[in-house]
A protein has these predicted regions:
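Serine-esterase "nucleophile elbow" of acetyl-processing enzymes
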Residues: 1-52, 63-70
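Cell-envelope and extracellular/periplasmic
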Residues: 50, 54, 78-79
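Switch II of P-loop NTPase G domains
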Residues: 57
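Alpha-helical cap/lid subdomain in secreted, periplasmic
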Residues: 60-209
């Protein structure tokens, strides 16, 4: 049986990619995705370059750190801060597309988790939820378009995670906004199969090169 290659995994984006809200580092996305890949036989080298509060416009510095490694597989989580700061969706999507294209040009495979549906966060007033939900959905659609155009893989998080988070407040941290450790487990469970598929595709291509 052919040994799977070592893979350099990087996490880019905002507080979701960083892990804000989790009680322990091993509960965050990076270690959870690393564990999923390791269980599949990969030797994973993890780097988390995500910055809490980052917008899509500020991804450039993180991308430069990733391409300097260079990264093999990048997971990008971005959009929540663009929505919170009322960045026009077209501008946020354009910046995400630019970041994705730069990572691809440097040889990395890219998985982008689209903006979450923030309307289900307990901190969001009920009266504002329809507007917030619509804004999140609009950004998610544009993100998917630009990521696919740039050669990345889209992981849609909006509707599926909204159902889980909207019915279980234990998935939120004490700030009622960021995920808890249990919340990150739900997100990682959605992302891990997609990340594994991309890693397997990369390994298959490398084995025939």
């Amino acid at each position: 049986m052919t040994a799977l290659p070592r893979i350099r995994l990087v996490l880019l984006g905002d507080s979701l990619a960083y892990g804000t809200g989790a009680a322990r580092r091993d509960q965050t996305l990076g270690p959870r995705l690393t564990a999923a890949l390791a269980a599949a036989g990969y030797a994973v080298e993890l780097h988390v370059f995500a910055v809490p509060g980052a917008t899509s416009a500020s991804l450039g510095a993180q991308v430069r750190r990733a391409t300097a490694l260079p990264a093999d597989l990048a997971v990008v989580v971005s959009g929540a801060n663009d929505l919170a700061r009322l960045v026009p969706p077209a501008d946020a999507a354009r910046d995400l597309g630019t970041a994705t294209a730069a990572l691809r040009a440097a040889g990395a495979d890219v998985v982008v988790a689209t903006a979450p549906d923030m309307s289900v966060a307990p901190v969001v007033p009920r009266g504002a939820r329809p507007l917030v939900r619509a804004g999140c959905a609009a950004l998610e659609r544009l993100q998917a378009e630009v990521v696919q155009a740039a050669g990345g893989t889209v992981a849609r998080l909006g509707a599926e995670l909204a159902t889980a988070f909207g019915t279980d407040t234990s998935l939120f941290a004490t700030d009622r906004y960021h995920p808890s450790g249990a919340g990150y487990a739900v997100i990682a469970a959605r992302l891990a199969p997609i990340v594994r598929t991309v890693a397997d595709r990369r390994a298959a291509i490398a084995s025939t090169a």
